[in-house]
Each structure stands twice: as structure tokens, then as C-alpha cells.
Regions:
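Active-site-proximal loop/short-helix segments
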Residues: 139, 174-189
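An N-cap/entry alpha-helix motif that binds or orients negatively charged groups
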Residues: 1-7
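Active-site-proximal beta-alpha core segment in soluble small-molecule metabolic enzymes
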Residues: 10-176
Length: 189
């Protein structure tokens, strides 16, 4: 249903933290799986989700976790950039593996997830300092259980503004926008 509404260019990325028990039934439905912990990553490996369909997100990744993914799967998958320090860790690991990885800058909508706009612009303006990390776009998770579409619409305008300013100020064309809108799910109705 979502693909019908959003069109064929849109991909559905299931956030495993929502319910890791759904990964089996969604294996052939979701285009990608957002994985935020080593445990979630292990579940994906066990179930046989190809790395090409995994977005390694969140700050709960240590060097050994990143190195394992890169050493085992090369440059498959997408990594999120949670901070400049995290970007430097991704660059170091990718350089050690002699690969160039795909990454998205995780921008915050004011919650605890991601980096602020100013830092995102600084990272994009210095993207050539990180030759082993190909920044393909931005990611934003803005919360959950939103009942009003007007809030989602406002966030989409805000993200569009960021992408427009990145083009104007940094001559950067984002290829990917990953947006977690936090649709309302009536669990108890």
C-alpha cells in the first residue's frame, strides 16, 4: 500500500527497533532494514538479509562492529553518520579495508538522534577529506506516533529546505533522503 501511495522510487525501510520479530515476515516486503545495534545486525545475518538491504544506523556501533561488517561484506549496505567523530571512525575503518562505503548524514529534528544542520553542512563542505566515505544524502528520524499529517508535512518542507541549501551553499546534490516520519499506529484500538 505504501508503495502505491509514494510511488516506485520510494523504498520502505523497516526500523528493526520497532519489532525485531517482524523481520522474517517482512523479509520479502521491506526494501531495507534499519539496524541500530550489534544484536539487530546479528538477527539480520541469521535470517539472511543481504547487506545491500541494511542501513547500519545509530551510535551503538563500536570499531569491532563496523570492521566486522566492512570486512565481511565490503562496501555493501549504508552507514549513518551520527557525528564528526563517528564519521572519522567510519573513514578509518573503510580505509583499513581499502573500500569506499555508502553513508547518510543523520540530521536531527530537535530530538536526540543525529547532528544539527550546521554540523551537517560542515561535514558536506569537507566531504573530500573523507575519501573512503561516499555521502549519498541525509537521514532523519523525527519521532513516533504522529497523528497529524501537518507535522509530517512541515518536516518534509524542512528537509527539502536543507537539501536546497546544501545544493546552493555546498554545490551538493543529495541522491538519497531517508525519512522516518513516525506514522501513528493504533496499537490498542
Amino acid at each position: 500500500m505504501m508503495k502505491t501511495i509514494l510511488g516506485e522510487r520510494a523504498e520502505i525501510c523497516f526500523a528493526m527497533k520497532a519489532n525485531p520479530f517482524l523481520i522474517g515476515p517482512l523479509k520479502d516486503t521491506a526494501d531495507k532494514f534499519e539496524v541500530c545495534s550489534p544484536g539487530e545486525f546479528h538477527i539480520c545475518e541469521t535470517v539472511g538479509i543481504p547487506m545491500e538491504r541494511i542501513v547500519l544506523s545509530g551510535v551503538n556501533k563500536e570499531k569491532c562492529d563496523i570492521t566486522h561488517a566492512m570486512h565481511t561484506y565490503g562496501n555493501a549496505g549504508v552507514y549513518t553518520i551520527e557525528s564528526r567523530k563517528h564519521l572519522e571512525l567510519l573513514e578509518m575503518c573503510a580505509k583499513e579495508e581499502n573500500i569506499t562505503i555508502h553513508a547518510l548524514i543523520r540530521v536531527t529534528s530537535g530530538n536526540q538522534f543525529g547532528i544539527d544542520e550546521e554540523e551537517a553542512f560542515n561535514i558536506v563542505s569537507k566531504k573530500n577529506d573523507y575519501p573512503h566515505v561516499r555521502i549519498e544524502g541525509i537521514q532523519c528520524y523525527s519521532g513516533t506516533q504522529k497523528k497529524k499529517f501537518s507535522k509530517i508535512e512541515k518536516e518534509l518542507h524542512w528537509l527539502d529546505d536543507i537539501l536546497t541549501r546544501l545544493k546552493e551553499t555546498c554545490d551538493y546534490d543529495a541522491e538519497v533522503l531517508e525519512y522516518g516520519p513516525g506514522f501513528y499506529i493504533p496499537y490498542f484500538e
